């Protein structure tokens, strides 16, 4: 199974992936951001901007790596990464589904204030990139079709992991 955990920056994607990895047999966390850094970092300029999803190779490389890790290495994979574009969902997750891989999308949601406060708690400062783009990430991730939405406001990691496991079963 491949489980993509989306939502705005600071909503708890990585924290919840870490909470799930010990509860899902033979699972690992896949860092799609590292793929994005590699793709974008090898261009002498940023021809497609700063959003990884705008780089055509980002979708293709994630698709290929996830497919290989699942089919040839046998892993269940957790991917904590904001998806902003339906097109990215289609190019990665829908293709994996068409290949017969059980693929799920969980979309975490929280109020602006909750996300803002969580970003500050992890050590970021006002005016940082993720802080400046909270609304873009909230709106973009909430419009991607094909996922199960989970509200995270006022809930513990344990409560959210339990709900996620129920959704995945």
Regions found by a protein language model. Give the residues of each.
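Small-molecule kinase domains that catalyze NTP-dependent phosphoryl transfer to phosphate-bearing small molecules
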Residues: 121-163
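ATP-binding Walker
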Residues: 11
